[in-house]
Amino acid sequence: MIYVSRRLIITCLLLLIACVMAGVWGLRSGAVTLETSQVFAALMGDTPRSMTMVVTEWRLPRVLMALLIGAALGVSGAIFQSLMRNPLGSPDVMGFNTGAWSGVLVAMVLFGQDLTAIALAAMVGGIVTSLLVWLLAWRNGIDTFRLIIIGIGVRAMLVAFNTWLLLKASLETALTAGLWNAGSLNGLTWAKTSPSAPIIILMLIAAALLVRRMRLLEMGDDTACALGVSVERSRLLMMLVAVVLTAAATALAG
């Protein structure tokens, strides 16, 4: 039986309340400020069509995706910190975000502005980068310090590659890529949430299923192995989940 502390329950409730309050504020705010009662009426469909569209088609996707992206990045960071046990063990420092950005640039240069291609390319770029770092760091097992150092080196090479792609791209593509790289939820609609949002939800479920392995790995490799955990396979699986979460979030918001 899993014991859940009162402190954890209270913390989760407070975070849930904060998310609801932030969501309502996000639905109210914009070029046209709405009252809270108007927001709830629009969600129920009891307002004029124009107001309902503003709330449900424009603001609601951005609010929900902001919460989903925050959850993805938070869980991804927690997984990396658990695996690396080092403040430098984060997706941005190790180059996985940069790998996703490389995938986006390649998609923009080769496939134009197709949103589905860009989203998939971001995830492929992040996954390929993580596998490359993992393979380069493998020496009869993975040492986290070596993994971080190699990740920093791969990130530096990808930054140079991305700069070269931007220099070779057309002016329009370079400007679009620069705006995308800045990161924004502006213009995000329901149609643009696929395939990234479903993938994030699936990876969050996968992360929840891997919590037991993660806790055992935190006790040390020998202890985890004695308790029946395949250490290297579990590490690779958790890292892939964390990378996909980061890449999918990057595909949504830049």
Predicted regions span which residues?
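Alpha-helical transmembrane segments in inner-membrane proteins
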Residues: M1-G254
